[in-house]
Amino acid sequence: MKTLVLLSALALLAFQVQADPIQNRDEESKIDEQPGKEDQAVSVSFGDPEGSSLQEECEDLICYCRTRGCKRRERLNGTCRKGHLMYMLWCC
């Protein structure tokens, strides 16, 4: 009888561990589907206070954190984080 209770507890624990990632993915998808939050501009700054050729080249660079692919002529420039979620950084 004790063995049956122990096996049942282990099975329930295994189901709970598998269910937690599914709940986290559901929360992420709810966040992803909110309109207006997907395309938020990100400020890009460089360390040299006097400026550099790289800074001059990227002066008009506009970047967005989003989960989905690029739009127009954007390209992937790295990752960004909003809270505990990681997103892709797309710049044009």
From Swiss-Prot:
- Start-end of Basic and acidic residues biased regions: 24-40
Give UniProt keywords alphabetically.
Answer: Antibiotic, Antimicrobial, Defensin, Disulfide bond, Secreted, Signal
Instruction: State the Pfam families in the record.
Output: Defensin_1, Defensin_propep
Any GO BP? defense response to bacterium
SUPFAM superfamilies documented for this protein: Defensin-like
Disulfide linkages recorded for this protein, renumbered to the chain, are C63-C92, C65-C80, C70-C91
In the UniProt record, the signal sequence range is 1-19
Q: Where in the cell is it found?
A: Secreted
Highest rank taxon of the organism: Eukaryota
Please give the residues making up the propeptide in this record.
20-57
What cellular-component terms does GO give this entry?
extracellular space
- InterPro entries, per the entry: Alpha-defensin, Alpha-defensin_C, Alpha-defensin_N, Beta/alpha-defensin_C
Q: Where is this region: Disordered?
A: 24-53
Q: Which family does it belong to?
A: Belongs to the alpha-defensin family.
Biological function = May have microbicidal activities.
* The protein, known as: Alpha-defensin 25
* Taxonomic lineage from the root: Eukaryota, Metazoa, Chordata, Craniata, Vertebrata
Q: Which gene encodes it?
A: Defa25
